[in-house]
């Protein structure tokens, strides 16, 4: 088998594993998994084995054939007789993964790239001495920076002294004329320096370019006779000389403070438990919310979950009761958001990543969505708000809550609205929810 075949086989195995994960989420037994271990059923593959050729059994001896004695145990019940169907389940095993691996597998399956951000600072450590300040102990002085700044200033202020001195030998030129000419030539020389040189001229420089008693009739003649020596050439020939160091250029090194932030998350799961939420709807909620819990547990360092049930009132429940509880009252979704807002006061948004997931069949009391729920969703700071409408295909869709929320928030990057009508919709709903979150706030 070549490299190409190996690669294709690898992709086939990976794709089959992702399909197994999707089938488990949509149709598998979620109750067999716990908060710290997800048990995904996998199909067993028969290992290669030698078998007798069914067409080469050999012959029999002479005479009548008598039936032989049965060897081994008789067939177990459940395998079926003749054309009857058996009642044994297919061979399978479970692959147990932790939430981190589950999150990675789901990311790969859905093509997600959620990178949660830490918020709460739990520790500070000193890193390398890469930061600088204007003040500090003399022992931490960054002399290289100080010298470099001085050298830059030296180069910026440098000029060819012999060239300027030569301008003083132009016929009829004095200090003012030379200074005006130097300014026009962008030569960084002061009038005081020119005046001092005029009082005590230097007949030549190290290069011997200016000769004694040389006088030019015009500045053009001087410029034609004397070449300007570049600063780089002078420094290479005689060194930089005295470099001016100034206190304003002093910088002192200190270690960079590295903040270690803990990635904390609190997830508020809200479910309508009113009389209209029959078992088929509750199952769709469980198949959507449970993988989200596993996913966020795997993504964050510390995950806490709050479960709120509501009809016309709202109350906190344990996770074990959350998906099975049912009441006979009406529906007022805002009561759940009011309770969620109070609960989240204990989880400051500056320190916690916050998710608020709600689910129901879309039914709500008159005007409660517009007057109460939508304002509350605006007031509750969260990485992501999501509403999952569960409407099995065998029922009449009468709820309007999801549509009103969708209209109110539009394409807002922290509000997701999705509808689940059957298990096949669950993976799409999860993808819609997780891909809606703006990764900058995660």
Swiss-Prot record:
<protein>
    <recommendedName>
        <fullName>UPF0229 protein VNG_0746C</fullName>
    </recommendedName>
</protein>
<feature type="compositionally biased region" description="Acidic residues">
    <location>
        <begin position="72"/>
        <end position="88"/>
    </location>
</feature>
<dbReference type="InterPro" id="IPR006698">
    <property type="entry name" value="UPF0229"/>
</dbReference>
<dbReference type="Pfam" id="PF04285">
    <property type="entry name" value="DUF444"/>
</dbReference>
<feature type="region of interest" description="Disordered">
    <location>
        <begin position="55"/>
        <end position="91"/>
    </location>
</feature>
<comment type="similarity">
    <text>Belongs to the UPF0229 family.</text>
</comment>
<dbReference type="InterPro" id="IPR036465">
    <property type="entry name" value="vWFA_dom_sf"/>
</dbReference>
């Amino acid at each position: 088998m070549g490299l190409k075949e190996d690669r294709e086989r690898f992709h086939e195995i990976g794709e089959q594993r992702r399909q197994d994960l999707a089938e488990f989420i949509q149709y598998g037994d979620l109750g067999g998994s716990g908060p710290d271990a997800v048990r995904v059923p996998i199909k067993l593959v028969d290992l290669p084995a030698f078998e007798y050729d069914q067409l080469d059994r050999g012959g029999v001896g002479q005479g009548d054939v008598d039936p032989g004695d049965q060897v081994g145990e008789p067939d177990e019940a459940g395998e079926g007789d003749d054309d009857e169907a058996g009642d044994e389940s297919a061979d399978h095993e479970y692959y147990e993964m932790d939430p981190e691996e589950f999150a990675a597998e789901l990311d790969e399956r859905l093509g997600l790239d959620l990178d949660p951000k830490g918020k709460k600072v739990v520790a500070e450590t000193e890193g390398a001495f890469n930061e600088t300040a204007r003040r500090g102990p003399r022992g931490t002085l960054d002399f290289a920076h100080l010298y470099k700044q001085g050298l830059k200033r030296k180069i910026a202020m440098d000029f060819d002294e012999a060239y300027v001195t030569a301008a003083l030998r132009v016929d009829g030129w004095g200090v003012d004329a030379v200074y005006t000419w130097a300014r026009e030539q962008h030569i960084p020389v002061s009038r005081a320096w020119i005046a001092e040189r005029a009082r005590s001229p230097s007949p030549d420089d190290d290069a011997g370019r200016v000769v004694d008693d040389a006088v030019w009739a015009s500045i053009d003649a001087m410029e034609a006779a004397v070449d300007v020596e570049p600063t780089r050439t002078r420094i290479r020939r005689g060194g930089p000389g005295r470099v001016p160091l100034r206190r304003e250029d002093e910088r002192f090194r200190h270690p960079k403070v590295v903040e270690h932030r803990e990635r904390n998350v609190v997830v508020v799961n809200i479910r309508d438990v009113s009389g209209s939420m029959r078992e088929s709807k509750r199952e769709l909620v469980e198949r959507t919310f449970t993988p989200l819990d596993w996913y966020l547990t795997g993504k964050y360092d510390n995950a806490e979950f709050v479960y709120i049930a509501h009809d016309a009132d709202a109350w906190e429940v344990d996770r074990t009761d959350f998906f099975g509880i049912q009441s006979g009252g009406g529906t007022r979704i805002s009561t759940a958001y009011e309770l969620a807002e109070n609960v989240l006061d204990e989880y400051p948004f500056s320190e916690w990543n916050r998710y608020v997931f709600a689910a129901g069949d879309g039914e709500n009391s008159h005007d409660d969505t517009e007057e109460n729920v939508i304002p509350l969703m605006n007031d509750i700071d969260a990485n992501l708000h999501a509403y999952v409408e569960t409407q099995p295909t065998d029922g009449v869709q009468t709820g309007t809550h999801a549509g009103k929320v969708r209209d109110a928030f539009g394409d807002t990057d922290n509000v997701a609205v999705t509808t689940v009508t059957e298990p096949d919709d669950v993976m799409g709903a999860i993808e819609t929810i997780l891909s809606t979150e703006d990764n900058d706030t995660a």
